[in-house]
């Protein structure tokens, strides 16, 4: 497939795109929202030959898309609750991401359930049956065992090798299964957005949308305060938990999911995600997951979040206590608030069907997505899961094509490599040999281009001692990934900002690259 456009996003391209839109005619599609669903729609539209612009009032991955567990789920939880369709789709989409779209960003994550005395025979049998069902889903989805190994039981000696702080009294081995894990969710959003730009989409951050109808939007550059009207044959609302601001007829029920951040040393540097059944629940777990930058993310919760929707949700003290109490049931040495070095919370844009009633738990609300058309003709997509973003984008775009009689090719994203995948290395393909492993892990085949494009001094040195992010990555965030301010670099292009003390150490370095 031809890719005549650059994948680079930066201030100059943003300015040129805004000028072109203000001076030009109508587009085929306008997408509102720069999370994973929105960028997925922009990529799908661009690769079908449609003219498309995406506008985001903040930065890419500003909302829910950066607050996930960083997992590409195979749908096991949905199978356990009877949602066979979602489970199968999740397994299929996981396989597409791991083998075709983004093998450089998604890898197999071992999930360890330690068999402790507190876990009775019935619960053990249910977990084992669930893991076997997960194996069957993997086979059904066509994902090879070389990509996601089969589940199995392991002895206690192996359990303590891969999760050294697990409780050893009465440990009877463990159950080990595998799921997909992203190097980072915001990095996936960035890869999809830049691949969309590579195919001609205009990706515009810090641009607000108002007076939205099915064929027009008033856009305001939030940096210059200049506004202009833009027309399109289809306007798609992919604003996530903020979708109701675009179409007030939508009924959403936001659910908050909280994670705590630890230094991996607090868990003795595990190599598997410690997976702890939540007491009293059949198919819910708390995960302590090894992550990039030497961190552990512990999550997650599922709590009703009524009321005004904040830009940056905050964890509650009750959620923090719940996560610590749950994980400590499986640890020989307890972790506490003194060990927590950061925390984050995100809001799931669940559809409020009214069926569960006011007292129903958000954990029981469907994770399926839905497409709606407002009285003014705005097409909205709400609900869904990160794993299914590609399928959701295909679904809503098919609906838009039908409703608006757009002339478009068939969907091409199932087999489309994102920027950084081996088949899409960028303009300076080369080996990652000699480059920091963490750089290659975050950029894949594009890592050589990150280093080659750097004009700064000491490009492969870390931005600060003990922080495994290179100076070249800060520069690339500005020159190729559309970062316009310090928060863009620290909170979304890299995830240094999840740990406040690390953030403080590199703010000056980020400002240095923004001022160049």
From Swiss-Prot:
A Pfam family hit: DAO_C
Entry EC no(s): 1.1.5.3
Protein name, as recorded: Glycerol-3-phosphate dehydrogenase 1
Catalyses which reaction(s): a quinone + sn-glycerol 3-phosphate = dihydroxyacetone phosphate + a quinol
Localisation per UniProt entry: Cytoplasm
Taxonomic lineage of the native organism: Bacteria, Bacillati, Actinomycetota, Actinomycetes, Mycobacteriales
Cofactor entry: FAD
Family named by the database record: Belongs to the FAD-dependent glycerol-3-phosphate dehydrogenase family.
GO CC terms of this entry: cytoplasm; peptidoglycan-based cell wall; plasma membrane
GO biological process, one term: glycerol metabolic process
Gene for this chain: glpD1
GO molecular function, one term: glycerol-3-phosphate dehydrogenase (quinone) activity
PANTHER family documented for this protein: ANAEROBIC GLYCEROL-3-PHOSPHATE DEHYDROGENASE SUBUNIT A, GLYCEROL-3-PHOSPHATE DEHYDROGENASE
């Amino acid at each position: 497939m031809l890719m005549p456009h650059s994948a680079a996003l930066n201030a100059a391209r943003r300015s040129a795109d805004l000028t072109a839109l203000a001076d030009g005619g109508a587009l085929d599609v306008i997408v509102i929202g720069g999370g994973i669903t929105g960028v997925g729609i922009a990529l799908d539209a661009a690769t079908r030959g449609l003219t498309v612009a995406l506008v985001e009032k903040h930065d890419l991955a500003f909302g829910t898309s950066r607050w996930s567990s960083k997992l590409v789920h195979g749908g096991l939880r949905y199978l356990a609750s009877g949602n066979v369709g979602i489970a199968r789709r999740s397994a299929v989409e996981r396989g597409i991401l791991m083998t075709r779209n983004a093998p450089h960003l998604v890898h197999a994550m071992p999930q360890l359930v330690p068999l402790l005395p507190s876990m009775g025979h019935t619960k053990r049998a249910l977990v084992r049956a669930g893991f076997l069902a997960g194996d069957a889903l993997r086979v059904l989805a066509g994902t090879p065992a070389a990509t996601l190994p089969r589940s199995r039981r392991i002895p206690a000696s192996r359990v303590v090798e891969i999760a050294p702080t697990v409780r050893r009294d009465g440990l009877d081995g463990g159950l080990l299964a595998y799921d997909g894990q992203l190097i980072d969710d915001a990095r996936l959003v960035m890869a999809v957005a830049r691949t969309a730009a590579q195919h001609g989409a205009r990706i515009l951050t810090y641009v607000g949308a108002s007076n939205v109808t099915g064929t027009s939007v008033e856009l305001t550059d939030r940096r210059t305060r200049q506004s202009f009207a833009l027309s399109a044959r289809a306007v798609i609302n992919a604003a996530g938990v903020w979708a109701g601001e675009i179409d007030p007829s939508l009924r959403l029920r936001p659910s908050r999911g909280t994670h705590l951040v630890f230094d991996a040393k607090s868990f003795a540097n595990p190599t598997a995600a410690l997976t702890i059944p939540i007491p009293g629940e059949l198919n819910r777990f708390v995960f302590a997951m090894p992550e990039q930058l030497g961190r552990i993310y512990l999550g997650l919760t599922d709590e009703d979040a009524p009321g005004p929707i904040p830009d940056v949700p905050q964890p509650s003290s009750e959620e923090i206590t719940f996560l610590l109490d749950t994980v400590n049931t499986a640890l020989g040495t307890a972790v506490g608030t003194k060990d927590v070095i950061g925390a984050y919370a995100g809001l799931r844009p669940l559809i409020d069907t009214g069926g569960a009633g006011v007292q129903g738990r958000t954990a029981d609300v469907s994770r399926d997505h839905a497409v709606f058309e407002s009285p003014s003709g705005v097409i909205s997509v709400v609900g869904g899961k990160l794993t299914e973003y590609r399928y959701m984008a295909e679904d809503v775009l098919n609906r838009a094509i039908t409703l608006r009689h757009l002339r478009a090719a068939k969907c091409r994203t199932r087999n489309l490599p994102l920027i950084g995948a081996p088949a899409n290395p960028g303009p300076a393909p080369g080996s990652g040999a000699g480059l920091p492993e963490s750089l290659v892990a975050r950029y894949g085949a594009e890592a050589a281009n990150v280093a080659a494009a750097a004009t700064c001094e000491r490009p492969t040195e870390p931005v600060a001692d003990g922080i495994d992010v290179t100076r070249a990555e800060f520069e690339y965030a500005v020159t190729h990934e559309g970062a316009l301010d310090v928060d863009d670099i620290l909170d979304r292009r890299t995830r240094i900002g999840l740990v406040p003390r690390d953030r403080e150490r590199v703010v000056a370095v980020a400002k240095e690259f923004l001022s160049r």
